[in-house]
Regions:
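Carbohydrate-interacting/catalytic domains
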Residues: 1-54, 66-71, 79, 83-87, ...
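Aromatic- and acidic-residue-enriched segments that line the glycan-binding/catalytic groove
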Residues: 56-64, 100-130, 368-377, 753
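Conserved, well-structured beta-alpha core segment at the onset of a catalytic domain
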Residues: 75-93, 101, 105, 112, ...
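N-terminal beta-alpha lobe that positions the nucleotide/phosphoryl donor
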Residues: 93-94, 102-109, 114, 397-412, ...
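Conserved short loop/turn motifs at secondary-structure junctions
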Residues: 99, 327-334, 778
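Active-site region of glycoside hydrolase catalytic domains
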Residues: 105-180
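Active-site microenvironment for binding and transforming phosphate-containing groups
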Residues: 467
């Protein structure tokens, strides 16, 4: 595919992410472009907007890559949005989904064709389907796990029915509809021909029976089958229209089949799919899916034809200059991420691309990837850890263990969760991987006697021991030291944990993982292992272990480490300096559509690490009071502990939102209840507990007293302002998630996808745009300080793009004094200096609550109140020489040793620009 370079790239000051759906369309987005331009962002960052499944709320369930989503307004509305962006001088970044498609009946023409024609479909190679699985019953067949009960019961209950539309035939099961293979219709149509006496219908039936078999996949047979079936289908439709008696005879035969379970069973047995009970998906699904969602089937974008078919519209938008950048969703699901990104880079002329890549704490983004960086979770977690007190975090962990009785260390929780996911939700993926390994072992006399059960057991252990999401080996290419190290660490971990496993088999698997054995089957195994490993990590850690182990949930974020004890300012500086050197245009974020808690919620919860004793006293008292609201001891103490953290982080919150969040958390934890095996008794007890607790006026009084006594709201706001400043000044391109430009106390989706009141934000911005810090601080309850800060810093970024560009660097500034550990200070290119507080509980001691008190909080942070417990206590920052102007307050400061108190006198953070 020829390169289509991104046209006239605009300086990337900041992106603003919006979630598009039927309730927020292209035209709705166009209506807020003026506000976003006034705010100072440079790019609108859109969720996927190719045609998605009907009613999609997110766009990741694409059904047609050839057009824009009709529910968003289609091409016309998109052109209006594009014109409005151009008028405002804004660019556009688009989220794309190369890994999978939604299986939404007729809406996905490719999948419909696969169901109709099996391996002989023109699109069979578009999807990652195993046409020769270990289960012989599924040979050349796609499992369709859509039934609410066992197949035979559903069939005999009359819930399956053949339907005719013109010359096409389908089977309907409630809202599900699947096509009948044209070749399977010959007997039914032959009987109808006999009934009606139609020789022409008899000829059509015979011709359908002579169509090339679905097993034939040579190009000539595929072309013949496709051409002939369409001709015959069209003639059949004409015949039914021209001769009512023929149509009546066909419909009578359809009715007869529907009334005879044996006849219908025989017809369904001739299809290229197997209708099945939905529970079979976990163990028998024969196509790769997005995690455990069987309605999202994996695509083979490693195939150039598939890449071109899925990216044609996207690359047209890039070539036209409509789209200035791309965010690649779930890059770890692909068979060959490097190859895909190379092809995408070539097709976009080395355009701006970031990837949704979840990095482990000690993992680096592959330097060979032609991308600007990640979508920002690595930055998010550095900031979250920075705002956690290490000593307090250790105490919180001990408190959590005492409260819940949970004695397992986090690595053990992860290991157990990953094994459970592989036994249950992703058993089909493990089974397919086991089959590949068994085939490989058959070719080695020292390995061939290992049974499938043994191999399955070993594979589960190796995947569970993998410390990163996946490796990136590429057949025929050198294996990187990082991939060798990750594979070796996993194998060593299994050897320690399971000495009963054959050591020679472990060595053999370790060699396979790094392409140490030649052969296509061996290479296929290594590639498939990486894809399975990624899915298991995501489902086992993010969506299971994170909901089981939760001492301090500000750390339980995508890519985070719940067992972390925080990060020092020095560690943060090292990470940012490395980012400036290697990924200076990576995306930065604090909140996304996928975060489990917003940045503001995490800012509050992180404060608990500074209050471990007070926190333990509070939850002990709350638990005693609320014991009476439980039913038979349910919910368990882990859920109760999570509820209390959630209330601290998101207060005020009503029982509906809190209950929905706790319910989702319990289902994800998969201990007492789950999505696939819900326990109504536990679910009801949990919901009733949340409702009763929040209706208990005495408890609410205790909770609000705790929040007020420790100034959680005010201190959380100060921490949020510090984190937001880092977002807007550290190396990279900051992204603001919709609505988070003011205080946002959202939880995991769907809570974080609620409608945004843009009119209120527009009015507030208009009132504060030209105001000083005191006016902004006085609007604290409305989110004024955060909005004002973002506006000021984005305006500065737009006026001085070079100061934040790829060559702008990052240099820590020395901080000295008793409170040095509470300050983070650095420069960018020597022309911008940033000073923000961290661990603010030890600094802000005099706040009493309310909007006006946030203004006093700024003075308290600066050491301006005599009643502070030390305040900044003479803490100094060594500024480079010269005169500096505060971008936020307009105040002037001379370089050299400057007191933090002086810099933060009027606002909780300082951003200084060196005067020319």
């Amino acid at each position: 595919m020829p390169a289509t370079p991104m046209q006239h790239p605009r300086p990337r000051a900041a992106t603003y992410r919006v979630q598009l759906h039927a309730g927020f369309t292209f035209d709705d987005a166009a209506a807020v472009v003026g506000y976003l331009a006034d705010l100072g962002v440079s790019h609108l960052y859109c969720s996927p907007y190719l045609q998605a499944a009907e009613g999609s709320t997110h766009g990741y369930d694409v059904v047609d890559h050839g057009r824009l989503n009709d529910e968003l307004g289609g091409g016309g509305a998109h052109r209006r949005l594009t014109r409005r962006l151009a008028q405002a001088g804004l660019g556009q970044v688009l989220d794309i989904v190369p890994n999978h498609m939604a299986l939404a009946g007729r809406a996905n023409a490719w999948w419909w064709d696969v169901l109709e024609n099996g391996p002989s479909s023109r699109y069979a190679s578009h999807f990652d389907i195993d046409w020769d699985p270990p289960q012989h019953k599924l040979a050349a067949t796609v499992l369709m796990p859509v039934l609410g009960d066992h197949y035979g019961r559903v069939l005999e209950a009359g819930e399956l029915a053949v339907e005719r539309q013109g010359g096409s035939f389908t089977v309907r099961y409630h809202e599900h509809e699947v096509p009948l293979s044209p070749r399977s219709l010959d007997a039914l149509l032959t009987r109808a021909a006999q009934r009606s006496g139609s020789a022409e219908l008899d000829a059509v039936a015979a011709a359908l029976g002579r169509l090339p078999h679905a097993h034939r996949t040579d190009p000539a047979a595929v072309a013949e089958r496709h051409h002939d079936k369409e001709v015959l289908r069209a003639r059949l439709a004409e015949l039914c229209g021209e001769r009512p008696a023929v149509a009546a005879a066909i419909d009578a035969e359809v009715d007869a089949v529907n009334g005879d379970a044996d006849a219908l069973d025989q017809l369904l047995g001739q299809q290229n799919y197997r209708l099945a009970y939905w529970r079979t998906a976990a163990e028998e699904l024969s196509y790769r899916r997005f995690f455990d969602i069987e309605t999202l089937a994996g695509l083979r974008v490693e195939d150039e034809a598939v890449f071109e078919a899925t990216h044609r519209v996207i690359l047209r938008l890039v070539a036209e200059g409509t789209v200035d950048g791309l965010r690649v969703d779930h890059v770890d699901g692909l068979a060959d991420p490097q190859g895909y990104l190379d092809r995408l880079s070539e097709a976009t002329g080395d355009g701006y691309v970031v990837v949704e890549k979840i990095l482990a704490a000690d993992e680096e983004l592959p330097g060979s990837w032609p991308v600007a960086g990640t979508s920002g979770y690595d930055f998010l977690n550095h900031v979250s850890r920075l705002c956690v007190d290490s000593g307090g975090a250790a105490a919180i962990r001990a408190c959590y263990a005492r409260f819940t009785g949970a004695g397992e260390a986090y690595p053990e929780v992860v290991h157990a969760a990953k094994l459970q996911i592989m036994r249950e939700d992703l058993a089909a993926e493990v089974e397919r991987l086991t089959g590949l390994l068994a085939d490989v072992c058959e070719g080695y006399r020292r390995q061939r006697d290992h049974t499938r059960r043994e191999l399955r057991d070993v594979l589960r252990e190796v995947v569970a021991a993998f410390g990163v999401y996946r490796g990136y080996v590429r057949p025929g290419r050198p294996v990187t030291p990082a991939d060798r190290a990750h594979a070796a660490a996993a194998v060593a971990g299994v050897r320690r944990r399971r000495p009963d496993i054959d050591p020679e088999l472990m060595t053999f698997i370790g060699e396979l993982l790094v392409l140490g054995r030649p052969g296509k089957a061996e290479a296929d195994f290594a590639v498939r292992f990486a894809q399975v490993s990624s899915a298991v990590m995501a489902k086992g850690v993010e969506d299971t272990a994170f909901y089981r182990y939760q001492p301090l949930v500000s750390l339980n974020e995508v890519g985070g480490d719940p067992a972390s004890l925080g990060e020092s300012a020095g560690g943060f500086h090292q990470a940012m300096a490395r980012m400036a050197r290697r990924w200076p245009e990576t995306m930065l974020t604090l909140s996304t559509h996928d975060t489990k808690r917003s940045g503001d919620v995490r800012a509050r919860i992180g404060l608990l690490s500074e209050l471990p004793e007070a926190w333990e006293r509070a939850i002990a008292a709350w638990a005693r009071r609320n014991e009476r609201h439980k039913r038979g001891g349910w919910p368990d103490r882990n859920a109760e502990y999570l509820l209390y953290q959630t209330l601290v982080g998101a207060w005020p919150i009503d029982s509906a939102r809190a209950g929905a969040f706790l319910q989702k958390a319990a289902r994800e934890a998969k201990v007492h209840t789950s999505w696939t095996d819900p326990c109504a008794e536990y679910d009801d007890a949990l919901g009733a507990f949340v409702t009763a607790v929040l209706a208990d006026q005495g408890f609410v009084a205790d909770l609000t007293a705790f929040l007020a006594g420790h100034r959680i709201v005010e201190r959380g706001r100060v921490s949020s302002l510090a984190q937001t400043t880092l977002l807007l000044t550290c190396p990279g391109v900051p992204d603001l998630y919709q609505g988070t430009e003011v205080w946002d106390l959202s939880l995991v989706d769907p809570d974080n996808r609620r409608p945004v009141d843009y009119e209120a934000r527009r009015r507030l911005l208009a009132e504060l745009a030209g105001a000083g810090p005191e006016a902004a601080l006085a609007r604290g309850d409305e989110g004024g300080p955060k909005l004002w800060l973002i506006h000021r810093l984005l305006q500065h970024r737009r006026r001085h793009p070079a100061g934040f560009g790829p060559d702008s660097g990052y240099q820590p500034l020395p901080v000295t004094g008793a409170r040095a550990a509470h300050a983070v200070a650095f420069t960018r290119t020597g022309g911008l200096a940033v000073v923000v507080p961290r661990l603010v509980t030890g600094l802000v001691t005099g706040l009493a609550g309310g909007s006006a008190d946030l203004a006093r909080g700024s003075a308290d942070l600066a050491g301006g109140s005599a009643d502070l417990a030390g305040g900044w206590a003479g803490t100094m920052v060594e500024l480079p020489g010269g005169a500096w102007t505060d971008v936020l307050t307009g105040g002037r400061i001379d370089g050299g040793a400057v007191g933090v108190a002086a810099m933060l006198r009027r606002f909780p953070v300082a951003v200084l620009a060196r005067e020319a």
